[in-house]
Swiss-Prot record:
Name by which UniProt lists this protein: Arginine--tRNA ligase
Pfam families: Arg_tRNA_synt_N, DALR_1, tRNA-synt_1d
Keywords: Aminoacyl-tRNA synthetase, ATP-binding, Cytoplasm, Ligase, Nucleotide-binding, Protein biosynthesis
Entry's EC annotation: 6.1.1.19
MF annotations from Gene Ontology: arginine-tRNA ligase activity; ATP binding
This protein's GO CC annotations: cytoplasm
Known partners and oligomeric status: Monomer.
Tagged with keyword tRNA-binding: no
Keyword Disulfide bond assigned: no
Length: 590
């Protein structure tokens, strides 16, 4: 009901100005959704803060506002008579015919009443970001699916979204890995398919062990890094092959999860690192400390009480993550052709990186690399834990590979489906079972994560996420199938424009819940919390169930039949759209 809320807010402000033309204070109606259905649809609390400047009782002030409101024909066409409650709250109820008109407008509208923003400025969403030569593991799950969902919501709102994958494709680790492979398996550096990612990970572990224990190997590895940074063709070819091999494996995961990303790794920003230092120097922020060049943070002190530094060049002359992140921020906000021209940059990483980003963001702001009204945001998330409350691991104590986790989810979904089909005496072919199990399994993993407040840790449980009851993906997928089936049974019967008729309280509850969709999308866009959308979809399914259980639909008479079928269709469309914004595909049958 965003359009209605915006119209009401304008009408209230104008009424307050007419009622109190001499008040210098800001006239804010403080309009918000009503806390309880008996209070109407909205509540305006703006009379209370005016009591002191006007030296009047809030109820008298509310009465004057209501009187001015009722003189406005546009308000009279929108709302029933306002009610003053408590110390001076104004309760507002939207006219039933206006609510019915809003439902009618959303029927067949693919946007379901969600307005599009009018802006060409890019929004960058930086998410997933695995490391080359390492397999994606459960730790990449949250960044990947939270980032994808936020990107989908922002795109739906009409933003030009850059989905960037800031892969770890540069640094000392490549020097040691290339050196190790040259010595023990040179054939792996001839072509990208000479080694699979699992073997590459094993080689990486061997290289790391040698690097930690062998000073000669360490020195050779550092020489290899210098060659790589200097553009040595042999080193660059080896590096490119390693990146290609990892990239192919990452893409298999992304394709499976229906994730779209544009890779722009750390190496992309190499040409811009020197200018980061010169820019910080020009801004008079750069300080040399123990041979390292850094920026000391304001308001962030260490245990010794001294300001903490953000090091941008180490004492050995090398750059680090902070330098690369500063170069990325500068590039992303810079106008084309020098950058992306973004006005909002969102980083989706684990909460453990919060201090790092807080420091880097402060430096970027003090260097004036963030344009006026530019937004730089860190979207932190907690850990994925096992049911024992500890970090999710395999039985052997290793990190869970993301591929294995997804495989198990699909296998368990298939086992559940086959068991249910047997209990129901249904026979389905393997193609149907494979499709449904694949959809449900991946949906369950995504929804279990997205339905949690991302800031907290959450316990991973296949049993809970695959349950057909409760706030789960299988429950919502089944709700879509069921509701769409009810609508189909109604055939092509549709209510004529302007002829929707609702009389039962269960109908009005469903109408009001359906009309919240645009406000929920706006909230997710602003707060970057996908769990708000999950909570809404689950509540919508619950409200629909009460409506369908208590009010006849297919046996309804007169204009009630097409009107109630319209509610079924709009509910199915809203659930499908909402799940789609979470990256979850729906099914025709289960």
């Amino acid at each position: 009901m965003l359009r209605i809320a915006q119209a009401l807010d304008t009408q209230l402000r104008e009424a307050m100005q007419r009622a109190f033309p001499d008040v210098d204070a800001l006239l804010d109606p403080q309009l918000a959704p009503a806390n309880k259905p008996e209070f109407g649809d909205f509540q305006a609390n703006g009379a209370l803060p005016l009591a002191k400047p006007l030296k009047q009782a809030p109820r008298l002030i509310a009465g004057a506002i209501v009187e001015a409101l009722q003189a406005d024909p546009a308000f009279a066409a929108l709302c029933l008579e306002p009610q003053i409650a408590g110390p001076g709250f104004i309760n507002l109820t939207i006219r039933p015919e206006r609510l019915a008109a809003e439902v009618s407008a959303r029927l067949g509208d693919p946007r379901l009443g969600v307005p599009e923003v009018q802006s060409d400025a890019a929004v960058v969403v930086d998410f997933s970001s695995p490391n080359i030569a390492k397999e994606m593991h459960v730790g990449h799950l949250r960044s990947t699916i939270i980032g994808d969902s936020l990107a989908r919501v922002l795109e739906f709102r009409g933003h030009r979204v850059l989905r960037l994958n800031h892969v770890g494709d540069w640094g000392t680790q490549f020097g040691m890995l290339i050196t190790h492979l040259k010595q023990v398996a040179p054939e792996t550096l001839n072509r990208a398919d000479a080694v699979d990612l699992g073997d590459l990970v094993a080689f990486y572990r061997e290289a790391k062990k040698r690097f930690d224990e062998d000073e000669a190997f360490q020195a050779t590895s550092r020489e290899e890094v210098v060659k790589l940074q200097g553009g040595d063709p042999v080193s660059l070819k080896a590096w490119g092959l390693l990146c290609d091999q990892s990239r192919r494996e990452f893409q298999k995961i992304y394709d499976r999860l229906d994730i779209r990303l544009s890779e722009r790794g750390e190496s992309f920003y190499n040409p811009y690192l020197a200018s980061v230092l010169s820019g910080l120097k020009e801004a008079d922020l750069l300080v040399t400390d123990d041979g390292a060049e850094c920026v000391f943070l304001e308001g962030v002190n260490g245990k010794d009480g001294k300001p903490l530094p953000v090091i941008v060049r180490k004492s050995d002359g090398g750059f680090n993550y902070a330098t690369t992140d500063l170069a990325a921020i500068r590039y992303r906000f810079a106008l084309a052709p020098d950058g992306d021209g973004a006005r909002r940059v969102i980083y989706v990483t684990d909460a453990g990186q919060a201090n790092h980003f807080a420091g880097v963001f402060q430096v970027a702001k003090r260097a004036n690399w963030i344009p006026e009204h530019g937004r730089l945001e860190h979207v932190p998330f907690g850990l994925v834990q096992g049911e024992d409350g500890k970090k999710l691991k395999t039985r052997s104590g290793d990190t869970v590979r993301l591929r294995d986790l997804l495989d198990e989810a699909v296998e368990r979904a298939e086992a559940d489906l086959r068991r249910r089909l047997e209990e129901e005496g249904r026979s389905e072919d393997d193609q149907f079972i494979e499709h449904v199990a694949g959809t449900v399994g991946l949906a369950a993993v995504k929804y279990a994560d997205l339905s949690q407040n991302r800031i907290t840790n959450y316990q991973f449980s296949f049993d809970r996420m695959l349950a057909l009851q409760g706030n789960t993906a299988p429950y919502l997928l089944y709700a879509v199938v069921r509701i769409a089936g009810i609508a189909r049974k109604g055939g092509d019967l549709e209510a004529e424009a302007g002829m929707l008729q609702f009389s039962e309280p269960q109908e009005w509850s469903l109408v009001r819940e359906l009309l919240k969709f645009d406000a929920v999308i706006a909230e997710v866009e602003e707060e970057l919390l996908p769990n708000r959308l999950c909570s809404y979809l689950f509540e919508l399914s619950q409200v629909f169930n009460r409506f369908y259980d208590q009010v006849p639909v297919l046996k309804a008479e007169g204009q009630s039949l097409p009107s109630r079928l319209a509610l079924c269709r709009l509910t199915a469309d809203t659930l499908k759209s909402g799940l789609g914004l979470l990256g979850i595909a729906t099914l025709e049958r289960m």
